[in-house]
Each structure stands twice: as structure tokens, then as C-alpha cells.
């Protein structure tokens, strides 16, 4: 198994190290355009092997030829958000970067599974899908796993219970229009609505939607990376071990939930071939409308990239 991580910034480097520690690949490639950065970080990771007890070979590079025949490619390249910026503010700059990255990786890997982390997430996943010409099952956006983790952590904090007992997921676009689905949220099987007031639930939902911005505002210069990296690697683990995990991910819907030809976060089954099934769950009218509204925002932004992708 060969896994390539594009972008040696905080998210990419953290993900690469986690991939190696979990021994998900015999070969881990960390690529960045800045000379010396991926090489130095990869060497540092490799030297932690005797302590972390892993044998994965990790190396850094600036040459896309070194990514040849990758089984999975994690794209984290792009500008990070700064205080006051929305994910959509990054649209044109990161779309140009993701387009170039996708074109380059596809020169050397014929049938990889691409996992997108770059923001704005759903739109960048669309860009990579269009440019790669891969089957839709093999181009996946990491969004719902992260958003759901944030929602779960806030619930656990509020109730003072173990995170392991929180089951929750977030659908929709990876932005302010995301849709935390409260009615499927439970704590060891107990519905969230039996443990918290609607006012408190609404507060947690709002904090989840603003979870990324909360971290950006603290950091001032940079954005979240530990949780995004862990979320992406959870998806990689599901693929490598063919776990058939049910995870909320950004995928191209083709009629599900009354939406078509748009990348949006929905529950999917993930295994060795990428997305094996899109699950259609029962949503109430308000949830379904919120999901479709979220998708319409993604569609609108994607339409602005027609010239770039032509």
C-alpha cells in the first residue's frame, strides 16, 4: 500500500505521521512545493519509528514522479483560513491549486482513491473529480467526519460523559450551512433530546457550525489540523482495511435526497474501493430542506469555476 499526502503543512504532516504510526501503508510520501519542508518533516517522522514502533517508509519530495502508483492520495494543499475569512473566500485561489495538483498526480497514478481536505471542501472535491476523470466512488471529501467529531465532542463536554458513547453525524456542505441531524443523535442509545433542552441543543448545533472559525480565531494565523488530520486518516483506515464503515462524507449524489450532480455530505459506506453505497436516511422536512439549501450553495460556487475547469 502506497499513500501520498499532498501538502506538508500542519494537516498534511500530521496526517502523514498518523498514517505511519497506524501502519496503514508500507510507503508514505509527503509532497510539497517548498523545497526542504517535506524532506525535513518526513525524516523527523521516520526517526520516530523506533519509538512509535512502526516500519512504514516515509519520505518527502517536491517531485510528483515520486507519487507514482499511489493507492490513496490525500490532498491538503491550499491556503488556510485566517480570522474573518469564510471557506468560500478561498474558492478561486484553492481551486487553481487543487486543479494543478490533481492534473499532476493523475500523470503518475492511474486509479487512486482521492481524499480531499482542502477548503472549501465540497467544491474542491468537485474540482478534483472533474479534473481526475476518476469514477465518483474514488473521489471523496472529508467533511462530515470532522464536523461530526466536533458535534460529538461538544455534546460529551456538555453532558460530562465519554465521547465513546456519543453517536452523531453532520450532513451537508462543510461550512456554515452544514446540517447536524439531531434526531439521530444519541448517548449510549438515549436520544439527545431526552438529556438536553432544545435551547442547549441549538447552542451546540451553532457551535458545531462555527467550530472551524472558533479555532481560527484562537490561532490568529492558521486553522485546525489535529482533528482534520485524524478525520481524514479515519477514512483512509476504512479503505485500507475494507471496514465497510458508515461515515458522513462528501460524495457526488445522483438523485439521492432529491439532489443530483453535486458533491455534498451524506452517510456513505466506505471500503477498499472507496464509496460503496450512499445511504438515504429518513429526514424530516426541515432537515431535508436544509440539506438541499446547503447543496445549492455548493452548486452555485461550482458554477463560478466553469472557465477554470474547461
Swiss-Prot record:
One of its GO terms (molecular function) is L-lactate dehydrogenase activity. Keywords: NAD, Oxidoreductase, Tricarboxylic acid cycle. NAD(+) binds at residues 7-12, 32, 94, 117-119. Substrate binds at residues 81, 87, 119, 150. InterPro entries: L-lactate/malate_DH, Lactate/malate_DH_C, Lactate/malate_DH_N, Lactate_DH/Glyco_Ohase_4_C, Malate_DH_type3, NAD(P)-bd_dom_sf. The active site is at residue 174. The keyword Amino-acid biosynthesis does not apply. One of its GO terms (biological process) is lactate metabolic process. It holds the Pfam family Ldh_1_N. SUPFAM superfamilies: LDH C-terminal domain-like, NAD(P)-binding Rossmann-fold domains. Its EC number is 1.1.1.37. Belongs to the LDH/MDH superfamily. MDH type 3 family. Catalyzes the reversible oxidation of malate to oxaloacetate. This is Malate dehydrogenase. It comes from Prosthecochloris aestuarii (strain DSM 271 / SK 413). The lineage of its organism: Bacteria, Pseudomonadati, Chlorobiota, Chlorobiia, Chlorobiales. The gene is mdh.
Amino acid at each position: 500500500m502506497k499513500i501520498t499526502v499532498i501538502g506538508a503543512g500542519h494537516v498534511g504532516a500530521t496526517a502523514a505521521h498518523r498514517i505511519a504510526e497506524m501502519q496503514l501503508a508500507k510507503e508514505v510520501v509527503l509532497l510539497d512545493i517548498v523545497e526542504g519542508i517535506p524532506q525535513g518533516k518526513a525524516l523527523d517522522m521516520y526517526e520516530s519509528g523506533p519509538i512509535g514502533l512502526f516500519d512504514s517508509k516515509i519520505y518527502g519530495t517536491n517531485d510528483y514522479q515520486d507519487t507514482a502508483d499511489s493507492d490513496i492520495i490525500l490532498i491538503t494543499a491550499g491556503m488556510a483560513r485566517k480570522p474573518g475569512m469564510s471557506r468560500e473566500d478561498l474558492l478561486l485561489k484553492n481551486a487553481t491549486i487543487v486543479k494543478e495538483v490533481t492534473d499532476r498526480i493523475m500523470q503518475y497514478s492511474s486509479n487512486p482513491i482521492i481524499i480531499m481536505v482542502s477548503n472549501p471542501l465540497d467544491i474542491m472535491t468537485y474540482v478534483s473529480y472533474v479534473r481526475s476523470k476518476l469514477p465518483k466512488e474514488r473521489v471523496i471529501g472529508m467533511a462530515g467526519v470532522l464536523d461530526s467529531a466536533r458535534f460529538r465532542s461538544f455534546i460529551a463536554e456538555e453532558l460530562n460523559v465519554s465521547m465513546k458513547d456519543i453517536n452523531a453525524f453532520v450532513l451537508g456542505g462543510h461550512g456554515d450551512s452544514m446540517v447536524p441531524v439531531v434526531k439521530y443523535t444519541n448517548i449510549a442509545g438515549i436520544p439527545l433530546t431526552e438529556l438536553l433542552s432544545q435551547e442547549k441543543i441549538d447552542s451546540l448545533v451553532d457551535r458545531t457550525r462555527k467550530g472551524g472559525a472558533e479555532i481560527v480565531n484562537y490561532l490568529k494565523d492558521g486553522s485546525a489540523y489535529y482533528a482534520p488530520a485524524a478525520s481524514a486518516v479515519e477514512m483512509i483506515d476504512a479503505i485500507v482495511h475494507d471496514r465497510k464503515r458508515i461515515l458522513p462524507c462528501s460524495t457526488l449524489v445522483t438523485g439521492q435526497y432529491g439532489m443530483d450532480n453535486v458533491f455534498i455530505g451524506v452517510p456513505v459506506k466506505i471500503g477498499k474501493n472507496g464509496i460503496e453505497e450512499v445511504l438515504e436516511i429518513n429526514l424530516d422536512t426541515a432537515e431535508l430542506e436544509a440539506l438541499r439549501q446547503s447543496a445549492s450553495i455548493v452548486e452555485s460556487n461550482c458554477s463560478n469555476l466553469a472557465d477554470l475547469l474547461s
